[in-house]
């Protein structure tokens, strides 16, 4: 029988299992928060206090003494103040519950709070010698973790366990052995003389720096739902489970993140300067192919008058030529390869430097004590030499903050002009004052420069944390919301805000457009060859124009000018300048129109909205959506609250798995000689956005399991259709298995698609391990599929539905209808663009890649690279011949003639393109009689950091997302699949039970939101689908008070004469997005209209109906297919690439040739020579090789 430490300290007990916690006795030792009845207090005061330090005996002594004698002369003593409270015995033990990192199990540690007394009693109980004399109580009470080993060596137990508290509720256990062989010989002899070995183990707890003696350590259980540790049983609330799952659990706490928010508006005092420009290029045959080189640049200045005057003075100072048609328009014309880019770069650098100096001057004027502070604190006589880190420590910063924005604007410049000029103009090393904090946002994407913004920031004295968010709810902001006052230099592309050509954009926004155009082919040939083919007046021949009509129009316009000779360069300059003027007017129109839309249509009069603050229409639409949600929910914080979250890390990929492409495939290949109608869903994504979306923080696993059980019970009832708006079924995203009904019940429009075979296929095969939304579950169930929810820890269930985007869509539809009544083409274009762009912002795909210039890697990126959490995937260097270079005389090096004679002496060692560096004769007055030749050391006016682009990627593949609620895109697509499923019912319900090959053809092609139906399909739409045809009336916006699927279609094939529904009498289908309708015939008036040719990726002007028919017939008969092809000129844009043949920031011209042929790699099974059907059990997908585990009953 061993004597060990137990709960008590007054006896010897054998080693036994711990009886566990005793709640009743523990509660008696706790202090009560409320008042205690008087009898109870009296009993506790009369109880003897044997363990007290002596102070508790004083009241008893006072009660035993007799009261003093009162005399007539003595003043009466004031009544004694009655003490209130509860006298409690100090606790002798503490309890700690934590997770052992070694076993990952939960333990409960009970420890003594008084280390000296606990050690003393323990030694007495076990009849061990007392503590050494040097281990005084005072020394033990002040003992920290650094002296614990010395204590163990002094006590010399058999074994010493040290339990150390770690962050996040963890503990680790280590041991200290005190055997003679492991200790120093002198210490061993000394300890043997002072105290014999203890024959029982000791356990210590280290909390911070404190050391306590452990009484016992027992394993306990841990609740997987709420994280509570317990011995036998416990109760956990829904609130605790929710909090633990989303904030404490290390595995799931980062699955959903709050979406950050800032008001949509800009600061009301923002000063803006717009530099609108356009570039003309010619083709130069270089070492990288046909490279486009700029020879002309025209720019126009607009904005705040003071800033415009500053920019005008700078343009005149740098000797820019002023265009005759406008005093604020300047140009540069030169065929030299780098001259245009260098001149534009010089102007942009000098302009941003002048604006930065102007901002810095106003800061110095507002803080006159800065100069004395810089001299006193940093020993700097000039404040310009301060760094930003030093400047932000300036006390008592004063002044009214300024916010200056410089916009470099053009039409389609991010995909062309900015790339051509990038090697010269991308620079942030302008000579701005040193105290500025310079940051850069550079993001190339899909061959375009999406962001190229540079910010020069100074401290804002008015900045503070906002507590009242009423202004934010109205879309406004003021001085306190900005941490810095700044100068921002931003590149913006009007094409990204209009999605159309400049001429069409001008028409859409009611801007005047000059007639005519320029023969750019002739200009290109003139710069390449020095001449071009022209008539006697110098006017380019017809071969340089698009067609004869364009040739005649432009020649007539030129003759009206009365010029004797055609000046091709001057004409090009005038047309380029006119394009710049139209673009500048478009900039002003966009800025004013969108501000008017936000103020009046959205109802945010205090927003001060600036459309150019964000680069794309998608980013602007998402900002408007967030602002509307913020105004409605009023979260009073800097995020959208817990209602709308963003999936992140593991959940991001899980949610993205539900975002599947649109339906686009033909079910008929060949020539169809029966009537064909085309129906299109009206605003499909907009209508889907008005439907209910998931809302709220996802449920914890326990509540989620209950919701999943409810779902499975409904899915198992195969004979009953489930309502999409059943209040008992919560929205969610699930992993499912699904089996289709009998093949006689299937149709050519499957309700779901799969990527399991490597290609996206709309299939009627069994589904295994697919991720689907709850809307898809209902769609599959109602179509007769048997759906089983597969247990998955990533399964997500939301607490409620909410029409989160309905108000946004309603605002745009109302604005569009009002614009139609007022015939306001501008407002109509804005409302239509914003309505269509929102879905795309939800579906934005994020990754862990980032492209930065070498000099732009901040401290966080450098630490990530050194720690191995960030990898450099590739590095690219700009072309050095695109960078300006100069010879610096101070670094010229002298070469002796004999040294020069040895240079490049062996012709076999040199390449054709490598020419020796130029040699210069020595300057006059060079001493010495020996003839020297000077070879300069050439210096580029760019640092190596400016020349090197790094593509960085995080090692962790999980995406951190706090911007986009991607699950909204998942449900938008799910609602569109529900639309098409209902549409399928109109067409194919009457065919159930008939084999597919025996059914009449009702539809032959589907493309996302459209369906090509035959005459029978048209009749069914006019009867069974009558309520979904727009001309018959109907709603486009979901009504929560009368929940029902809300979508409408309209016939796209309409007569050009009377507007009635028309049909194509003959058509040909070759492949997805490759078809042609011969013509349109109107049954009402009998007129014939022009047909339609759709050929994605091909030159549309080279295709016609007859060519596509011949292509199909040649393929069907086994003839040569190579003659059926189209060619078009293509621009290859390279921004940052690791490919050896692609150089950064180059645009090369190539000829793209595509072969025209019928669909070969089909994603459907063939029924006959023409008809196709989705894959099914009898016609499996040959690409599927995935093995899955199926348990047969």
UniProtKB/Swiss-Prot annotation:
DNA-binding among keywords: yes
GO biological process, one term: viral DNA genome replication
Subcellular localization: Host nucleus
Keyword DNA-binding among UniProt keywords: yes
Protein keywords: DNA replication, DNA-binding, DNA-directed DNA polymerase, Host nucleus, Nucleotidyltransferase, Transferase, Viral DNA replication
InterPro entries in UniProt: DNA-dir_DNA_pol_B, DNA-dir_DNA_pol_B_adenovir, DNA-dir_DNA_pol_B_CS, DNA-dir_DNA_pol_B_mt/vir, DNA/RNA_pol_sf, DNA_pol_palm_dom_sf, RNaseH-like_sf
Known EC number: 2.7.7.7
UniProt feature, compositional bias: Low complexity: 48-68
Gene3D superfamilies linked to this entry: Helix hairpin bin (1.10.287.690), Palm domain of DNA polymerase (3.90.1600.10), TPR 1 domain of DNA polymerase (3.30.1770.10)
Family recorded in the similarity comment: Belongs to the DNA polymerase type-B family.
Further facts: This DNA polymerase requires a protein as a primer.
Protein name according to UniProt: DNA polymerase
Organism: Human adenovirus E serotype 4 (HAdV-4)
């Amino acid at each position: 029988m061993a004597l060990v430490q137990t709960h008590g300290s007054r006896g010897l007990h054998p080693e036994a299992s711990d009886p566990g916690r005793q709640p009743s006795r523990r509660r008696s030792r706790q202090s009560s928060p409320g008042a205690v009845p008087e009898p109870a207090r009296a009993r506790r005061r009369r109880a003897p206090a044997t363990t007290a330090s002596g102070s508790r005996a004083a009241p008893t002594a006072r009660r035993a003494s007799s009261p003093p004698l009162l005399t007539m002369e003595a003043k009466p003593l004031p009544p004694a103040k009655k003490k209130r409270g509860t006298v409690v015995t100090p606790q002798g033990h503490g309890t700690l519950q934590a997770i052992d990192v070694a076993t990952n199990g939960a333990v409960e540690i009970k420890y003594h709070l008084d280390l000296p007394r606990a050690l003393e009693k323990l030694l007495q109980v076990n009849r061990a010698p007392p503590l050494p004399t040097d281990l005084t109580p005072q020394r033990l009470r002040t003992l920290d973790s650094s002296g614990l080993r010395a204590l163990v060596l002094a006590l010399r137990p058999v074994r010493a366990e040290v339990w150390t508290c770690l962050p996040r509720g963890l503990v680790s256990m280590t041991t200290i052995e005190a055997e003679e062989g492991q200790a120093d010989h002198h210490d061993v002899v000394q300890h043997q003389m002072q105290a014999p070995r203890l024959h029982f183990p000791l356990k210590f707890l280290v909390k911070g720096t404190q050391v306590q003696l452990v009484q016992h350590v027992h394993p306990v259980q841990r609740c997987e739902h709420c994280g509570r540790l317990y011995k036998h049983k416990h109760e956990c609330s829904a609130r605790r489970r929710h909090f633990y799952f989303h904030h404490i659990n290390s595995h799931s706490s980062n699955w959903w993140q709050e979406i950050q928010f800032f008001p949509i508006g800009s600061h009301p005092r923002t000063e803006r300067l717009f530099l609108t420009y356009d570039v003309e290029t010619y083709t130069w045959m270089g070492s990288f192919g046909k490279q486009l080189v700029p020879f002309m640049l025209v720019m126009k200045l607009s904005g705040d008058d003071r800033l415009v005057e500053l920019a005008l003075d700078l343009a005149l100072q740098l000797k820019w030529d002023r265009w005759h048609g406008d005093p604020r328009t300047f140009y540069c014309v030169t065929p030299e390869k780098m001259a245009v880019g260098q001149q534009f770069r010089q102007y942009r650098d000098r302009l941003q430097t002048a604006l930065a100096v102007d901002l810095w001057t106003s800061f110095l004027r507002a803080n006159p004590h800065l100069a004395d502070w810089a001299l006193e604190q940093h020993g700097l006589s000039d404040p310009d030499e301060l760094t930003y880190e030093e400047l932000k420590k300036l006390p008592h910063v004063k002044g009214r903050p300024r916010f200056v924005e410089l916009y470099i604007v053009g039409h389609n410049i991010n995909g062309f002009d900015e790339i051509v000029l990038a090697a010269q103009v991308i620079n942030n090393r302008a000579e701005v004052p040193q105290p500025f904090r310079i940051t850069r946002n550079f993001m190339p994407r899909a061959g375009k420069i999406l962001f190229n913004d540079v910010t020069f920031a100074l401290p804002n004295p008015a900045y503070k944390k906002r507590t009242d968010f009423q202004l934010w709810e109205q879309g406004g902001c003021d001085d306190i919301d900005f941490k810095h006052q700044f100068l921002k230099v931003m590149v913006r592309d009007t094409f990204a805000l209009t999605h159309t050509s400049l001429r069409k954009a001008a028409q859409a926004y009611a801007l005047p457009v000059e007639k005519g155009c320029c023969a750019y082919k002739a200009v290109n040939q003139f710069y390449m060859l020095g001449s071009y083919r022209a008539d006697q007046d110098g006017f380019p021949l017809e071969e340089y124009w698009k067609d004869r009509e364009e040739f005649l129009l432009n020649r007539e316009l030129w003759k009206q000018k009365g010029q004797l000779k055609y000046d091709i360069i001057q004409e090009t300059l005038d047309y380029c300048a006119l394009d710049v003027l139209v673009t500048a007017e478009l900039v002003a129109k966009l800025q004013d129109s969108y501000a008017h839309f936000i103020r009046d249509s959205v109802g945010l009069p205090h927003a001060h909205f600036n459309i150019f603050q964000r680069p794309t229409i998608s980013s602007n639409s998402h900002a408007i959506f967030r602002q509307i949600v913020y105004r409605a929910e009023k979260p009073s914080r800097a995020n959208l609250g817990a209602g709308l979250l963003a999936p992140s890390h593991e959940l991001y990929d899980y949610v993205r798995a539900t975002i599947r492409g649109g339906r686009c495939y033909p079910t008929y290949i060949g020539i169809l000689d029966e009537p064909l109608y085309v129906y299109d869903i009206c605003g499909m994504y907009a209508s889907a956005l008005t439907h209910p979306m998931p809302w709220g923080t996802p449920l914890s696993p326990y509540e989620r399991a209950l919701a999943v059980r409810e779902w499975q019970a409904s899915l198992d009832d195969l004979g009953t259709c489930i309502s999409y708006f059943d209040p008992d079924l919560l929205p969610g995203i699930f992993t499912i298995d699904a089996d289709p009904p009998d093949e006689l019940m299937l149709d050519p429009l499957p309700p779901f698609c799969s990527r399991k075979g490597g290609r996206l296929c709309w299939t009627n095969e069994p589904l295994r391990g697919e991720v689907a939304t709850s809307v898809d579950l209902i769609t599959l169930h109602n179509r007769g599929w048997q759906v089983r929810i597969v247990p998955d820890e990533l399964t997500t269930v939301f607490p409620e539905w909410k029409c989160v985007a309905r108000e946004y869509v309603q605002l745009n539809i109302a604005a569009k209808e009002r614009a139609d009544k007022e015939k306001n083409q501008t407002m109509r274009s804005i409302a239509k663009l914003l309505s269509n762009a929102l879905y795309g912002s939800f579906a934005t795909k994020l990754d862990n890649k980032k492209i930065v210039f070498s000099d732009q890697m901040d401290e966080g990126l450098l630490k990530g690279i050194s720690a191995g959490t960030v990898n450099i995937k590739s590095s690219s260097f700009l072309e050095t011949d695109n960078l300006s270079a100069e010879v610096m005389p101070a670094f010229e090096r002298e070469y002796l003639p004999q040294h020069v004679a040895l240079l490049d002496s062996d012709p076999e060692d040199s390449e054709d393109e490598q020419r020796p560096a130029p040699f210069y004769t020595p300057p006059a007055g060079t001493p010495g009689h020996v003839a020297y030749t000077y070879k300069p050391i050439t210096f580029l006016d760019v640092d190596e950091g400016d020349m090197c682009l790094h593509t960085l990627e995080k090692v962790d593949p999980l995406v951190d997302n706090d911007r986009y609620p991607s699950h909204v895109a998942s449900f938008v697509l799910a609602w569109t699949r529900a639309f098409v499923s209902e549409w399928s019912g109109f067409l194919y319900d009457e065919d159930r039970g008939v084999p597919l090959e025996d059914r009449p053809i009702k539809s032959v092609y589907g493309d996302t939101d459209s369906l090509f139906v035959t005459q029978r399909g048209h009749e069914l739409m006019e009867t069974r689908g009558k309520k979904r045809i727009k001309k018959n009336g109907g709603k486009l916006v979901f009504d929560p008070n009368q929940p029902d699927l809300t979508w409408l279609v309209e016939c796209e094939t309409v007569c050009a004469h009377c507007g009635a529904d028309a049909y194509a009498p003959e058509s040909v289908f070759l492949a997805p997005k490759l078809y042609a309708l011969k013509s349109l015939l109107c049954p009402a008036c009998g007129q014939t209209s022009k047909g339609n040719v759709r050929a994605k990726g091909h030159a549309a002007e080279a295709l016609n109906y007859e060519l596509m028919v011949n292509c199909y017939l040649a393929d069907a008969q086994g003839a040569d297919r190579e003659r059926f092809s189209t060619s078009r000129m293509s621009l290859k844009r390279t921004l940052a690439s690791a490919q050896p043949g692609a150089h950064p920031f180059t645009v090369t011209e190539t000829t793209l040739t595509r072969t025209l042929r019928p669909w070969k790699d089909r994603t459907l099974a063939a029924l006959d020579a023409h008809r196709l059907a989705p894959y099914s059990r009898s016609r499996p997908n040959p690409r599927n090789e995935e093995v899955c585990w199926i348990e047969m009953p």
